[in-house]
Amino acid sequence: MKKTLTTIRRSSIARRLIISFLLILIVPITALSVSAYQSAVASLDVQMTQSAKENVQILDHIIDDKISTTEKSLAYFSDWATAEKFQDKKKTELKQEFKQFIQMNDNVAAVFSSGKDGDFTRYPYADMPSDFNALERDWYKEAMANKGKTIVTEPYESISSGKMVVTIARQTVDGSGVVAIDMKIDDLVTTAKGINIGKEGYAFILSQNKKVIAYSGEKAGTELKGDWVDKLYKDKSGDFEYTYKGKKKKMAFATSQTTGWKISGTMYANEIHDAASRVLIMASIVLAIAIGAGMTAIYFVIRSITKPLRRIVASAEKISEGDLTETIEINSKDELGVLSESFNHMAHSLRSLIHGIKDSVEHVASSSEELTASADQTSRATEHITMAIEQFSNGSESQSEKIETTTEQINEMNDGLAELARAAAVITETSADSTEVSSKGETLVQKTAGQMNTIDHSVKAAEQVVKGLEIKSKDITNILRVINGIADQTNLLALNAAIEAARAGEYGRGFSVVAEEVRKLAVQSADSAKEIESLISEIVKEIHTSLNVLQSVNKEVETGLVMTDETKQSFKHISQMTNQIASELQNMNATVEELSAGAQEISAASNDITAISKESSDGIQDIAASAEEQLASMEEISSSALTLERMSEELRDLTKQFKVDK
């Protein structure tokens, strides 16, 4: 971005004007086009979503109307069909009512009923499978479980017709049976498929358990799965976006209050963008026309600016070559005309300036020659004085530096001795502390050894106890096996007794009951014995594990005893070495203190000598510095005079390049 801006700044005014005008044209129109496109997308999204919701509501009303009408008829049948109507002599009347109802309702596939005894009546008649039992059907069970309520089943394939239906059922008022109606869902499928949302969008209906009632490309009764299905059943109504087979889609849905079915409308998201793309195409056409018209206007505007600028540039080039007699012809009173007039004034001012510079150069050249000669004489005299002072100063400085070096070395030695004394004192104290800590460590190691011996005895005792538990657990297992054998034998005897009692007939019935109870108790005893045996087996396993752990602990304790003894011997050796070090340190402290006292006396004498030497050296250096400053000043004056003379010559040559008179 920075490189692009630099390139634009370095380009011509015409190019910058073209870029500026194009930006003024393109940016607003492009922004408007994008805004219009986004507004169109948002508006179409709202419209299509609203259309989907309206279609869902229409389909919901259709379902509610069909179900409500059927429920009202079913309520009539449940009030009318009492237990008396289920009897054989009344079945003809029941079938006649069913027949009339079917003739009046095309969407009904069958009407049927069943009493509590399973007596099934249906119109129209159909051959039912030999194992058919109405009492085992879902519609019968749900209706009997929801007394006074109408239930709607999941879509299923009718046994008689082989077509997909939903059953609407209700228990009779007197509770003697159930009356049900098989409603065709073909017309619902047709209605749902006839609803179009956008170009490729469609509506569909799912049951409460995610099974298809009406869905394009899916068979009724098929259970649907997927993340979008879970979202659909998360709320009662709403809309959401999802991806289906790699394409983005949008869905609006609602839940039927009557049946609990999910009624949904779905559409492809790209339809919205396809419809809105027309707006983008029109905006692009407008942008192209605007750029064409704008470029034509820009050409004439730029030409009116660049032509006068070229004349000014040509005149400026002549002036840059030294021709100050050049003037610009003024043809306008705009900003370019004002610039041309200012340019002419500038050329006139430059001519006057060059005349004045030529006169001043001659005067400066003669003055600089006189100043150079005077500065040379003064500089030579100052150099002689400076050389004499420097020789004396160098000797004094050398002496002072040697004294300072000696003093610093003595001070450093003194500081080192003091530090050595402090370190020796600290080491002595540390040695004493080490001796005390070593004694305490030896005592603690002895206590630890005693504790480790106690732990060793405890572990060995625990190992013996665990081994005893293992033996007793095996004895319990043997006893349980004996009990289990007794229970099996008792069970066999009880069975034999029951057989003998059965042979005895009526007289042996009481004994048979007792034998059965004895057999049950034997079975329970055997089961309990097996459970106890299983628990004992687990306990034996745990005992084995504990025994292994105790043996491992015993080995670790023995190892710990050996290491404790080694640690005790190490502490004794440390204590002996510490006492020896403390004795040697006390002797060293006395020697260091004597050296430190002597070094302090030498350091004090060196400091006095250094102070006197510095005072003498400082005075000589001040004189030398003043002389050097004067010499430097004279050299600068001489150099400046030479420079001024050279510059006046150069300035004289430069003014000769300008043409100030025609």
Curated annotation (Swiss-Prot):
Signal peptide: none
Cytoplasmic side: 1-16, 303-662
Domain Methyl-accepting transducer: 374-610
Modified-residue entries (Glutamate methyl ester (Glu)), positions: 370, 594, 629, 636
Membrane topology type: Multi-pass membrane protein
Subcellular location field: Cell membrane
Domain Cache: 152-228
Pfam families in the cross-refs: dCache_1, HAMP, MCPsignal
Gene Ontology biological-process annotations: chemotaxis; signal transduction
GO cellular component terms, semicolon-separated: plasma membrane
Membrane-spanning residues: 17-37, 282-302
Domain named HAMP: residues: 303-355
Keyword Ubl conjugation appears in the UniProt entry: no
Gene3D superfamilies registered for this protein in UniProt: HAMP domain in histidine kinase, Methyl-accepting chemotaxis protein, PAS domain
Keywords, comma-separated and alphabetical: Cell membrane, Chemotaxis, Membrane, Methylation, Transducer, Transmembrane, Transmembrane helix
Extracellular topological domain: 38-281
Domain of life: Bacteria
SUPFAM superfamilies per UniProt: Methyl-accepting chemotaxis protein (MCP) signaling domain, Sensory domain-like
InterPro entries recorded: dCache_1 (IPR033479), HAMP_dom (IPR003660), MCPsignal_dom (IPR004089), Sensor-like_sf (IPR029151), Tar_rcpt_lig-bd (IPR003122)
Oligomer status and interactors: Interacts with YabA.
Function: Chemotactic-signal transducers respond to changes in the concentration of attractants and repellents in the environment, transduce a signal from the outside to the inside of the cell, and facilitate sensory adaptation through the variation of the level of methylation. All amino acids serve as attractants in B.subtilis, they appear to cause an increase in the turnover methyl groups, leading to methylation of an unidentified acceptor, while repellents have been shown to cause a decrease in methyl group turnover. The methyl groups are added by a methyltransferase and removed by a methylesterase.
Similarity section: Belongs to the methyl-accepting chemotaxis (MCP) protein family.
Name of protein: Methyl-accepting chemotaxis protein TlpA
Name of the encoding gene: tlpA
